[in-house]
């Protein structure tokens, strides 16, 4: 199998590609023909990272930050689980699907060490013996003149519960990929075999259910949230003619936005309905121009803070004009004295812009993603202080008006 290793936002050297490979990769990365060649191209990934296979071609796209940092951020964003780098024990240049598979297998082994989690599930069946409660109405409707079978409802204590279904679905999704590590494939097979009696459920990426945790199932939290991450992100599959492509991809834009939102909400001690990506008024009075800021803080029906989280490849180390214009539109429509743009550190320098004739102050802040999850969350604490300050200013201005 041919292999191509790419890095987020970096342009590669030339590679020969077939038309099918070129067209399929063009859905994921920028493909540019090399002058004076018939079939050679340079490849430039955007914010999408991961790995995919196109026929006999294997392509790996590494993130700018390490994969342990990426997985720590993504797991915190999806379930507020604080994985440390030591929890992701794999070689530095491991492909993302292999890294996820190794992490899932390790988390499953820890969780299953106390035995498979069981729970009660309500079942309704027609049986020849009474179990649980007889559903009289159903019995009369379906079998008015028959004594057997009996329509019953009962609670079954089983391992075929949502938590195990999520883990099994995630393990089989990764196992369907061509993982590079034989040991990782073996560990995933062990996870699937352990869950052999659990139903295989298809979970849509946009509708992966949450599991409620308590003292009885807290030991499952890591493996469940890691499974939800796998199921929610990146299953990629397509076919062009005889060439089939599949892989696992994650959008760093989504990971960063979700992490900043969840981490700030936790630091500020606010519920989902009060802080995050919420519905805001339109820019114009006729409601023709919709606004969708990533971050807003609401006190009842009044917005007291607005901001955006941006994960971009910025070349001149300053916030792009378009981002500043967008933030100005948010602040204007919501009648706020200013707003905040949050970038990954290294993409834009912290700055403050006072807008002429508008009385608006636009602030730019950064979050360093390169350290441990505890270090990143510490920088979120400083960011939360800026959010509180902007909110306090907005409330002062409104009281003075």
Model segments located where?
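Catalytic core segments in nucleotide and nucleic-acid processing enzymes
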Residues: 1-22, 236, 243-401
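Residue(s) in the substrate-gating loop at a strand-loop-helix junction
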Residues: 1-240, 244-246
């Amino acid at each position: 199998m041919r292999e191509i290793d790419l890095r987020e936002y970096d342009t590669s050297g030339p590679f020969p590609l077939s038309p099918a490979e070129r067209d399929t990769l063009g859905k994921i990365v920028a493909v540019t023909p090399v002058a004076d060649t018939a079939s050679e191209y340079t490849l430039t990934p955007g914010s999408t990272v991961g790995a995919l296979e196109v026929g006999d071609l294997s392509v790996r796209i590494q993130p700018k930050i390490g994969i342990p940092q990426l997985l720590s951020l993504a797991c915190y964003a999806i379930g507020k689980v604080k994985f440390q780098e030591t929890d992701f024990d794999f070689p530095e240049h491991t492909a993302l699907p292999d890294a996820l598979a190794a992490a899932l297998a390790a988390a499953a082994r820890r969780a299953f060490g106390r035995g498979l989690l069981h729970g009660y599930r309500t079942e309704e069946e027609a049986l020849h013996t009474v179990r649980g409660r007889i559903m009289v109405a159903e019995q009369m409707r379906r079998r008015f003149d028959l004594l057997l079978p009996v329509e019953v409802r009962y609670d079954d204590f089983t391992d075929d519960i949502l938590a195990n279904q999520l883990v099994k679905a995630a393990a089989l999704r990764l196992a369907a990929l061509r993982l590079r590590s034989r040991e990782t494939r073996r560990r995933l097979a062990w996870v699937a075999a352990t869950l052999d009696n659990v139903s295989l459920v298809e979970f849509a990426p946009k509708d992966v259910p949450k599991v409620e945790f308590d003292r009885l199932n807290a030991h499952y939290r890591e493996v469940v949230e890691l499974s939800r991450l796998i199921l929610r992100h990146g299953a990629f599959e397509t076919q062009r003619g005889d060439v089939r492509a599949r892989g696992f991809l994650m959008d760093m834009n989504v990971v960063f936005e979700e992490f900043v939102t969840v981490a700030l909400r936790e630091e500020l001690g606010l519920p989902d309905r009060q802080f995050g990506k919420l519905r805001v008024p339109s820019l114009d009075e006729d409601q023709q121009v919709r606004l969708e800021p990533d971050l807003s803080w609401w006190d009842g029906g009044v917005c007291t803070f607005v901001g955006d989280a941006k994960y971009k490849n910025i070349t001149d180390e300053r916030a792009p004009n378009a981002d500043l214009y967008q933030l100005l539109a948010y602040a204007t429509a919501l009648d706020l004295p200013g707003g905040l743009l949050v970038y990954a550190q290294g993409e834009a320098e912290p700055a403050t812009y006072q807008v002429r004739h508008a009385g608006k102050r636009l602030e730019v802040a950064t979050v360093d993603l390169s350290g441990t999850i505890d270090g990143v969350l510490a920088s979120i604490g400083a960011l939360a202080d800026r959010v509180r300050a902007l909110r306090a200013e907005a409330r002062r201005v409104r009281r003075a008006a």
